Amino acid sequence: MADGYWNRQQSLLPHSGLHKRPRPDYEMPASGLPSGNEMHYLSREEDRSGHPMVKDSKTIGSAYDRYLQGQVPSFTSGEASTVGALGLQRGIGGLPNHSLSDPSAMIGRHGGGGPDLAPNGRGMNYGFQPPMDPVSRHGPEPALLPPDASPTLYIEGLPSDCTRREVAHIFRPFVGYREVRLVSKEAKHRGDPLILCFVDFANPACAATALSALQGYKVDEINPESSHLRLQFSRYPGPRSGGGPRSSGPPRGGHGSRGRR
């Protein structure tokens, strides 16, 4: 009977291999992917925490750093600030193995070539027009002055009662204007005195501008019989030491300066 009792007790004892109850709900399937229930469970956990669950983030970060180091060379602090201010980041334009010192890599972004780019990236002109040499600009050439041009104009056609202030009011707006000189001479025959007028400018170019603008100018627009101005370059420009005009303008009478001696 004793043998039968012990055989019966051994049959009632659990097998040594069955110490842990199998839990198929928490075991990973053979494919290595979580089941449908586990996927829903993981998504709910991520929604609660707000951060996705990423495995081995250190390995991913190191691989990304190696990728960046292999695509674009490193910059110095000064170069990085210059490139960063222009909105250019690493991996510019999706062009691998192209440095910023290669002009061909920048032609497509700015259209057309510019000045040579320095190897260190300094002095690069992104989208700015380089300064032009004033000599190389093609503009209208200034009008050629006649050979008898001078900085003094001789004026004819002024009324006999005009004043120096009135004449100066006509010529003062022109650039380079300096002064007006009026000389009144008695007429050979009875009549109004002859007014000699000289206007001095800074240079012949300024005098030529006034001559071109005022040639044929009508002094009095209300009076229909008003004379028109006639301007020409003076042959002997500049005031005389005595304050009067030089012997310029139209030829004088036959007695001239000899008759005064």
Swiss-Prot record:
Per the database record, which ranges form the RRM domain?
151-236
Composition bias (Gly residues) maps to 240-254
> According to the lineage, what is the superkingdom?
Eukaryota
Subcellular compartments = Nucleus speckle; Cytoplasmic granule
What InterPro entries would the database entry show?
Nucleotide-bd_a/b_plait_sf, RBD_domain_sf, RRM_dom
Q: Which SMART domains match?
A: RRM (SM00360)
* UniProt keywords, alphabetically: Nucleus, RNA-binding
Q: Does the keyword GTP-binding apply?
A: no
Cross-referenced SUPFAM superfamilies, in alphabetical order?
Answer: RNA-binding domain, RBD (SSF54928)
The answer to whether keyword Nucleus applies is: yes
Q: What is the annotated tissue distribution of the protein whose record heads this document?
A: Ubiquitous.
Which Gene Ontology molecular-function terms are recorded?
A: mRNA binding
Q: Which CDD domains match?
A: RRM_AtNSRA_like
Q: Name one GO cellular component term.
A: nuclear speck
Location of the region described as Disordered in the Swiss-Prot/TrEMBL record: 1-38, 232-261
Biological role stated in the UniProt entry: RNA-binding protein interacting with the enod40 RNA.
Q: What is this protein called?
A: RNA-binding protein 1
**Gene source species:** Medicago truncatula (Barrel medic)
Lineage, uppermost ranks: Eukaryota, Viridiplantae, Streptophyta, Embryophyta, Tracheophyta
